[in-house]
């Protein structure tokens, strides 16, 4: 915002703003009155910049697009890796992710899980009974932080007899959960949107797609 303010005072028009990871993108609403940051505040910051075009890589919430604050998101990062080997069964962690991403796939075997939080540290996941055992499945979502959802999904898939499981998330936040997930998932694909993961020492089955240099 300081840079935008300098540009405004100098009469410089910001024509293009590209954001790899939009902070607070998951906070569609305030869960507590004393939370310091929410999507509404981020919206005001972006409006203040007055850029002619704003592109965001895989924002969790589409509100900023529907409200005309950002023009559109970058293409999902599948488009950055042409010819990638994608399992024909794709599982989304919830219905919201299904509606965001299912248009990317031209096959019918796409599913979504339903999640129920039993306690602060325990998550129950239910999967569609149509998922067949001994099949290859890709779990796809926008963000992995603590990884709880993906640990629960893997266990649920194991209980159904599915062991060839792959994970792709656009934004990876913490290293420790990634490393632990790599012991379960056959491959994990992330981007360097949040952090320079390509410069970190990671297990061999974690692949980093560079969305910026």
Map each language-model feature to its residues:
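PRPP-associated nucleotide enzymes
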Residues: 1-213
């Amino acid at each position: 915002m300081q840079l935008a303010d300098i540009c405004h005072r100098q009469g410089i028009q910001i024509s293009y703003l590209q954001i790899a990871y939009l902070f607070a993108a998951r906070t569609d609403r305030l869960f507590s009155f004393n939370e310091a940051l929410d999507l509404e505040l981020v919206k005001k910051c972006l409006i203040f910049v007055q850029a002619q075009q704003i592109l965001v890589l895989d924002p969790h919430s589409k509100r900023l697009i529907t409200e005309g604050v950002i023009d559109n998101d970058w293409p999902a990062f599948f488009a950055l890796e042409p010819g990638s080997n994608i399992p024909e069964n794709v599982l989304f962690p919830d219905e919201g992710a299904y509606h965001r991403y299912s248009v990317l796939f031209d096959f019918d075997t796409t599913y979504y899980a339903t999640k129920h939080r039993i306690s602060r540290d325990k998550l129950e996941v239910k999967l569609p009974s149509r998922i067949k055992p001994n099949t290859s499945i890709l779990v796809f979502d926008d963000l992995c932080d603590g990884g709880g959802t993906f640990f629960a999904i893997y266990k649920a898939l194991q209980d159904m007899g599915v062991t060839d499981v792959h994970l792709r998330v656009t934004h990876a936040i913490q290293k420790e959960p990634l490393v632990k997930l790599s012991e379960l998932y056959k491959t994990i694909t992330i981007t360097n949107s949040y952090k320079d993961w390509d410069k970190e020492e990671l297990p061999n089955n974690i692949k980093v797609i560079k969305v910026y240099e």
